[in-house]
Swiss-Prot record:
Encoding gene per record: psh
Glycosylated residue positions: N86, N277, N301
Main enzyme class: hydrolase
Substitution effect: G341E: In psh5; immune response defective
Task performed by this protein: Serine protease that plays a key role in innate immunity in response to Gram-positive bacterial and fungal proteases. Acts as a component of the Toll pathway upstream of protease spz processing enzyme SPE and Tl ligand spz. Nec regulates the cascade by inhibiting psh.
Lineage: Eukaryota, Metazoa, Ecdysozoa, Arthropoda, Hexapoda
UniProt protein name: Serine protease persephone
Subcellular location, record wording: Secreted
SMART domains hit by this protein: CLIP, Tryp_SPc
Gene Ontology biological-process entries: antifungal innate immune response; cellular response to molecule of bacterial origin; defense response to fungus; defense response to Gram-positive bacterium; innate immune response; positive regulation of antibacterial peptide biosynthetic process; positive regulation of antifungal peptide production; positive regulation of melanization defense response
Location of the Clip domain: 29-78
Example of a GO cellular component annotation carried by this entry: extracellular space
Listed Gene3D superfamilies: Trypsin-like serine proteases
Main subcellular localisation: secreted
Length: 394
């Protein structure tokens, strides 16, 4: 059956397995490893048990299997008993609103020089990491994020963009990249009927956030000057009315500034509040994430060339300012509702270091054989820095 471009044109949301099937898995027997029996538990029940295994080096976060997606979040295969007496535990260390087109900037400049100093995005990232280190010290914070749900503080840059029509509606996501600026997709904010009102930060449950969340009014919207409604230059910046108050759950993220793609074994994730099932369109109230793999642009071009109608929106093909990513199992993807959210390059899961490599833009269907399209952040550093850090002030 042919795929419809209406799915591509909508905003994106995270897709995962059916929650109906997975909701009955709590308490079911499972295997953590071939030699370690387990039982399916919620993340809140599993985390205290798994903590000792991770600190002892017996398991890593990525070793914890998923039993499926329950009604309220991911269900994990958890060891049946706590790990390790004190004699077996080894130490673990850690390493340190108005909508307008922005002024025209020059073309892609990935690695310009700024005298003897760093470009603003790099300097800002160093400050973000310094503040994170000061806040967390050398304490290792364990979060169960190997599956779909995301615990508070794991992705403190995540922003939900609120629209007020006949009530509050969160249609797109974004990433906090500085104390007063959120990065998102241009198609989320490019019409009068699609004007965002505020951003919600620090919330995992988007409809029932805890006391630590912050809602901040959007002062202005800056759309890339070369965005004309197709799949190119799909990037925008929201300026907030005030600076955020940084907490453990609210903090800017680093931008990916390297023009080259990371090694093939790198870990990539998309995150957002989204639909659990493409048929019912029922949305998750909690922040979800899913692991993806980058697809080389030549392969991505072949995939899109096979889709009818793609030439209309991708007249130049899949070019260097885009990224392509896919879940090879065709289970997880971004789809309607998560546009503007991040494609995250995870550097170190233990100390929570990552960069925003892409902005969720579009795709051909959801969790299909055609990869999703993402705006490559490193192609737009001049645009971002000119708004967020004018005159190279960080």
């Amino acid at each position: 059956m042919p795929l419809k471009w209406s799915l591509l044109l909508g905003t994106f949301v995270l897709i995962s397995c059916s929650s109906v099937e997975a909701a009955v898995t709590v308490g079911r027997a499972c295997k953590v490893t071939d030699t370690m029996p387990g039982i399916c538990r919620t993340s809140s029940d599993c985390e205290p048990l798994i903590d000792g295994y991770i600190k002892s080096g017996v398991l890593t976060l990525n070793d914890v299997p998923s039993c499926g997606l329950g009604a309220w979040g991911e269900i994990f295969c958890c060891p049946t008993k706590p790990c390790c007496d004190n004699s077996t535990i080894t130490s673990v260390s850690t390493s340190s609103t108005t909508s307008t087109k922005a002024p025209m900037t020059s073309g892609r400049v990935d690695v310009p020089t700024f005298g003897s100093g760093d470009r603003p995005a790099v300097a800002a990232c160093k400050k973000i990491r310094e503040r994170k280190q000061q806040r967390s010290g050398n304490q290792l914070v364990i979060h169960i994020v190997g599956g779909y749900p995301v615990d508070p503080g794991v992705y403190p840059h995540m922003a939900a963009i609120g629209y007020i029509t006949f009530g509050t509606d969160f249609r797109c996501g974004g990433s906090l990249i500085a104390s007063r600026f959120v990065l998102t997709a241009a198609h989320c904010v490019n019409t009068d009927a699609n004007t965002p009102a505020f951003v919600r930060l620090g919330a995992v449950n988007i409809e029932n956030p805890d006391h630590s969340y912050q809602d901040i009014v959007i002062r202005s919207v800056k759309i890339h000057p070369q965005y004309v409604g197709n799949k190119y230059n799909d990037i925008a910046i929201l300026e907030l009315e005030r600076d955020v108050v940084e907490t453990d759950n609210i903090r800017p993220a680093c931008l990916h500034t390297d023009a080259t793609d990371p090694p093939s074994n790198s870990k990539f994730f998309v995150a957002g509040w989204g639909v659990l099932n493409v048929t019912t369109r029922a949305r998750s109230k909690i922040l979800l994430r899913a692991g993806l793999e980058l697809v080389p642009l030549d392969q991505c071009n072949i995939s899109y060339a096979e889709q009818p109608g793609s030439i209309r929106l991708l007249k130049q093909g899949v070019i260097d300012s885009l990224l392509c990513a896919i879940d090879q199992k065709l289970i997880a993807d971004a789809c309607k509702g998560d546009s503007g959210g991040p494609l995250i390059h995870e550097l170190n899961v233990e100390d929570g270091m990552y960069t925003i490599m892409g902005v969720i833009s579009s795709g051909f269907g959801c969790a299909t054989v055609t990869p999703g399209l993402y705006t490559r952040v490193s192609s737009y550093l001049d645009f971002i820095e000119g708004i967020v850090w004018p005159d190279n002030r960080v």
